[in-house]
Amino acid sequence: MEEVPRRQPGGLVEVEGVFQFYEDWECWDYVSQRVSDERLQRWLAMLTNNQLRRQVIREAQIWMWKHKGAAVRRNCGCRLCNPGWGSQVRNVEL
């Protein structure tokens, strides 16, 4: 039986950010279930601003490298399951 080819960092040509998207998603899925509530709420609030997305992923990667054996704290790290700072709709008066 053939083995599925594995992704190697920098070894494959990235097509329109597809590989980067999945790597970011896997990182977020892993980390968002394990970080403290305060850090998760901060990151969720930062994700409402598209310019801060790369910074959030970078911080998540650093956290993941430093805390390799971290225990799972929650089933889901999404904004719906973890309402807080980043969940409120912002009304802006112009």
From Swiss-Prot:
It comes from the Viruses. Keywords: Cell cycle, Host nucleus, Virion. It is found in: Virion; Host nucleus. InterPro entries: Lentiviral_Vpr-like. GO terms for cellular component: host cell nucleus; virion component. Seems to function as a Vpr-like protein, since it mediates host cell cycle arrest in G2 phase. Cell cycle arrest creates a favorable environment for maximizing viral expression and production. This is Probable Vpr-like protein. The lineage of its organism: Viruses, Riboviria, Pararnavirae, Artverviricota, Revtraviricetes.
